């Protein structure tokens, strides 16, 4: 990509050490600039703790980066864990702060149960190991996975989920998150836009994926992620068609967690023709009209 248009790269889904990412907020914003991202949303799992230090680093270093405050909220729909991203939220809004505190409590309870199940499977110290890897951030299943790889119980993160953390396995604990409707509501109350995250990753049939998108749209969701780094052209086209069908704006994001060969900030993030980028809702409000959903 040429130097003349790198500033228009939008990456609206990324993680830091505040949840299950491997880079600090400060390191992430520097990497975003290195990767020629012009607008970055930090969307850690059920926490906004990374936003303030990221803002401070951008200001301190004079980085040419537009930071969008965000969050990725864990929900449950039809026994599936579904993630809803909130973009351009007010991270100080009392309702959002209270809501995320409740999510943190749910996350801590789940982590305790996962550790207890692994203990029964002769894998001691999992909670302490996950907490150590979380470095004070939100403890996620990703931290348990890293701990199990570290202990030699599996060869990779994917192997951990296959052996221990997937549905029906030893360390699996059914999620007890909020509903999609509750996530959308708190995002809207905090002034943000609600985005259905990575809809192609939930292992849903075409029929169930359509049901999910319809449910999200019916409850006043704003957008869905259409473009990601690792994605077939066919999937991107299909997701764009679903967005158009349900009058949803389109978003794009790498879901970056750590430097790796196949997922990178800003990589391969573009929208197919016929959909509109969700960033238009806050960048050009004077040209935006409400649409019937």
From Swiss-Prot:
Keywords: Exonuclease, Hydrolase, Manganese, Metal-binding, Nuclease, Nucleotide-binding, rRNA processing. GO terms for molecular function: 3',5'-nucleotide bisphosphate phosphatase activity; 5'-3' DNA exonuclease activity; 5'-3' RNA exonuclease activity; manganese ion binding; nucleotidase activity; nucleotide binding. Its cofactor is Mn(2+). Mn(2+) 1 binds at residues 13, 15, 72, 255. Mn(2+) 2 binds at residues 20, 45, 257. Pfam families: PHP. Disruption phenotype: None of the 3 rRNAs are correctly processed at their 5' ends, each accumulates a precursor with 3 extra nucleotides. Binds 1 Mn(2+) ion per subunit. However, the sequence similarity to CV_1693 from C.violaceum tends to indicate a trinuclear metal center. Its EC number is 3.1.13.-, 3.1.3.97. It catalyses: a ribonucleoside 3',5'-bisphosphate + H2O = a ribonucleoside 5'-phosphate + phosphate. Mn(2+) 3 binds at residues 72, 83, 198. One of its GO terms (biological process) is maturation of SSU-rRNA. InterPro entries: PHP_dom, PHP_domain, Pol/His_phosphatase_N, Pol/histidinol_Pase-like. NCBIfam families: RNaseRnm (NF047791). Exoribonuclease that catalyzes the last steps of 5S, 16S and 23S rRNA 5'-end maturation. Removes 3 nucleotides (nt) from the 5' end of 5S, 16S and 23S rRNA precursors to generate the mature 5' ends. Precursors with longer extensions are not processed (7 nt at the 5' end of pre-23S rRNA or 66 nt at the 5'-end of 16S rRNA are not processed). 5S and 23S rRNA maturation occurs more efficiently and accurately on ribosomal particles as compared to free RNA; the enzyme overdigests free RNA but generates the correct 5'-end in ribosomes from rnm deletion strains. PANTHER family: EXONUCLEASE (PTHR42924), POLYMERASE_HISTIDINOL PHOSPHATASE N-TERMINAL DOMAIN-CONTAINING PROTEIN (PTHR42924:SF3). Since E.coli possesses another enzyme, CysQ, which has been demonstrated to catalyze the hydrolysis of 3',5'-pAp to 5'-AMP and phosphate during sulfur assimilation, it seems therefore unlikely that the hydrolysis of 3',5'-bis-phosphonucleotides will be the primary physiological function of YciV. Belongs to the PHP family. TrpH/YciV subfamily. This is 5'-3' exoribonuclease Rnm.
